Amino acid sequence: MTIKEHKVVYEAHNVKALKAPQHFYNSQPGKGYVTDMQHYQEMYQQSINEPEKFFDKMAKEYLHWDAPYTKVQSGSLNNGDVAWFLNGKLNASYNCVDRHAFANPDKPALIYEADDESDNKIITFGELLRKVSQIAGVLKSWGVKKGDTVAIYLPMIPEAVIAMLAVARIGAIHSVVFAGFSAGSLKDRVVDANSKVVITCDEGKRGGKTINTKKIVDEGLNGVDLVSRILVFQRTGTEGIPMKAGRDYWWHEEAAKQRTYLPPVSCDAEDPLFLLYTSGSTGSPKGVVHTTGGYLLGAALTTRYVFDIHPEDVLFTAGDVGWITGHTYALYGPLTLGTASIIFESTPAYPDYGRYWRIIQRHKATHFYVAPTALRLIKRVGEAEIAKYDTSSLRVLGSVGEPISPDLWEWYHEKVGNKNCVICDTMWQTESGSHLIAPLAGAVPTKPGSATVPFFGINACIIDPVTGVELEGNDVEGVLAVKSPWPSMARSVWNHHDRYMDTYLKPYPGHYFTGDGAGRDHDGYYWIRGRVDDVVNVSGHRLSTSEIEASISNHENVSEAAVVGIPDELTGQTVVAYVSLKDGYLQNNATEGDAEHITPDNLRRELILQVRGEIGPFASPKTIILVRDLPRTRSGKIMRRVLRKVASNEAEQLGDLTTLANPEVVPAIISAVENQFFSQKKK
C-alpha cells in the first residue's frame, strides 16, 4: 500500500474553488450586495484597516438610532473593555418590528410551521408589533424594568420570538433557555441570571409528541423564591395545567388587558440585549452577554452579506431560539432587515422526511440554513423524499454548528440544491454573535469542506498553540484567533468577567481565542478542525479528530464516526474511534454472516487501513468501537467528553448529562467499550 504524503490542509489540494451557479444570479431579486472576490477584498481590507470608518457607515445604514453615538469603538482585547457605538441610543424591538410595521404592515414577518401542519400561520409585521407591545405591557405592569433579566422557556413557536422582542422593548434582558433542558438546568440558569419572571407554555409539541413544559418549569422552580411571576402561553389548551395563585398567569388573559402599542425604551448601545448560556469546559454553564448595538449590527450585516438576503426573500433557519443560531438567524438578522423568517417547531422527520422540502415548496423559501446533523440523518434514511417537492426557489444553502465534511457538502449541493445553489458553510459561535468565517454568496468562490474567508471586521489569524506565535502566510495549521474587536462579540460572562477573560482573552494576549483549531490553505481559505480539545497528539503528531473522522466516514458502510484521544503510556495519547453504521449493515452486535459476511474484525481492519492510506500510519486508531448511536447534545453535537471518559475507563466520572438528547445510548456505549476494547486489552 502506498501512503500519500501528509500535507498541511491536505484536503484543500483535492478540491477546486467553485463559483456560484448561474441559477443563483438568475434568481436574485436585485443586484448582489458584493459582486465578486475583488469587491469582497476591498470591503474586507477597509473593515480591517479602517474599522471605525467602515462600521460607522454600516451602523448608520442598517440601524435606526434614537440618538447618535459619539465614538465608534473603544477599549481593547488586552483589557477586555471593548465597547462599540458609545453613547448611541436605540431599541432592538423598534429596529426589528416598528420601522417595518410602519412602512409595510401587511408584509409577512414570521411564518410559523407548527408541529402539526394544520396549525401553520403567518404573522405580519403589523400583527407582530401589536403582539409584542401587549406582552411588553404585561411585563412593564409587573414591574420589569430596564436591566432586569427575564427567563424564557418556550418551544420554537412565534410566542418565543414575541417574548424576546417584548423583553427587549422595555430595555430588559432576555435569557432564553432551550425548552429541551431539564428542570435542574432551567433552575441553574434562572438563578444565575437572577430572573424574577419566567415565560413558558402549558405544553410543547414536537415530532408528534407532547412535552409537559409547565410541569418541568414547576419542578425546576420548586423552592426558588426568586421567581415572582410566570407567564404561561396556551400552546395546547390542555385542561388541568397546575397554576399557582399569585405567581402563574395566562398569556392570553394578561395580554388582553394591554394596549396594542407600547413605546419602546431607548437603550444604550452597550446595554445588554440578552444572555445565552453555553457549556463551559468546567461543566458549569456560562451566561454569555451580548449588547444591543454591536450585536444587532453583526446580525444584520452577516445576514445581508453572507446570505445575500434581499427584502423579498424568505429565510428558513432550521434552528431553535434556545441556541445562538435561532437568536441571530431566525430572529434578529432577518427581522432587522425586514425579511420574512420561518419559525419551525417540529423535526425533519415528522410526520415524514419530506417535511423540510414541503416547507420550502409551500413558502418558496429562498434560503435554507441547517446543521450537518440533520443533513446526515436525511442522507441516511430520507433522501428519496427530496425529489418529490419543488425546491427551485432556493438560492442559498447554509450549514451551521459544526464543520461540514466535503462528501456531505457535495451531497447537499447536488441532492438538495440540484447544483443550482451556493453553499455557505459558516463558522461562528455563541460568543461571536454572528459569522466569523463564511463565504459571501455569489462573491466568494466556495470549497467543499472549507468555511472559506473571514467576514468584515474579523481579523482572523492562526496561532501556534505551543509557542503562542502567529503563523504568517498560507499552508499553516494551529488554533484560530481574532486579533481585533468586532461589533457583535460577547462583552462578558454574566457576573463572571474574570471567567470571560480567562477563557477568551488571556490564552493568547491581544487576541480573542475561539477554542477551535484551523488551517489556512494555499489560497488563504480557512478549514475548521473542531475544538482544540478534540485534537490529539500521538508521538508528536498533532492530529485533528475531524480529519480522522472524515476518513473513516468515507467507508461505504459507515454512517458516522467520532474520534477521541485517550492517555497512552507509550505515545502520550492514542486514537479511539467510535463508529455507527448505516442501516442494513453491520451493527455492534453483528456476528459472522451479517451484513454480506462483513465481520466486526474485518470492518475494523478495513477502516484502519483506510485511515493509514488517506492520512498516514501515525493517524491510525488504536481501536474502533462499533456502536448503534453516538451521544448528542440537544443541539445535535456529539458529546465527545462522554466518549473520552468511557474509553479512558472513567465511566463513573461522566459529569452532567442533562444536555444529552439521547442518554439511553450511554449504557450501550459503556458495554460496547468493555466488550470490544477493555476485554481485548486483558487478553
Curated annotation (Swiss-Prot):
ATP binds at residues 401-403, 425-430, 516, 531, 542. Keywords: ATP-binding, Cytoplasm, Isopeptide bond, Ligase, Nucleotide-binding, Nucleus, Phosphoprotein, Ubl conjugation. There is a cross-link at residue 506 (Glycyl lysine isopeptide (Lys-Gly) (interchain with G-Cter in ubiquitin)). The keyword Transcription does not apply. It catalyses: acetate + ATP + CoA = acetyl-CoA + AMP + diphosphate. AMP binds at residues 425-430, 516, 531. Pathway: Carbohydrate metabolism; pyruvate metabolism. Its main location: cytoplasm. CoA binds at residues 206-209, 325, 539, 612. GO terms for biological process: acetyl-CoA biosynthetic process; acetyl-CoA biosynthetic process from acetate; pyruvate metabolic process. Its EC number is 6.2.1.1. One of its GO terms (molecular function) is acetate-CoA ligase activity. The modification Phosphoserine is found at residue 679. It comes from the Eukaryota. SUPFAM superfamilies: Acetyl-CoA synthetase-like. Catalyzes the production of acetyl-CoA. Provides the acetyl-CoA source for histone acetylation in the nucleus. 'Anaerobic' isozyme of acetyl-coenzyme A synthetase, which is required for growth on fermentable carbon sources such as glucose. May be involved in the PDH (pyruvate dehydrogenase complex) bypass. Present with 225000 molecules/cell in log phase SD medium. Belongs to the ATP-dependent AMP-binding enzyme family. This is Acetyl-coenzyme A synthetase 2. It comes from Saccharomyces cerevisiae (strain ATCC 204508 / S288c) (Baker's yeast). The gene is ACS2.
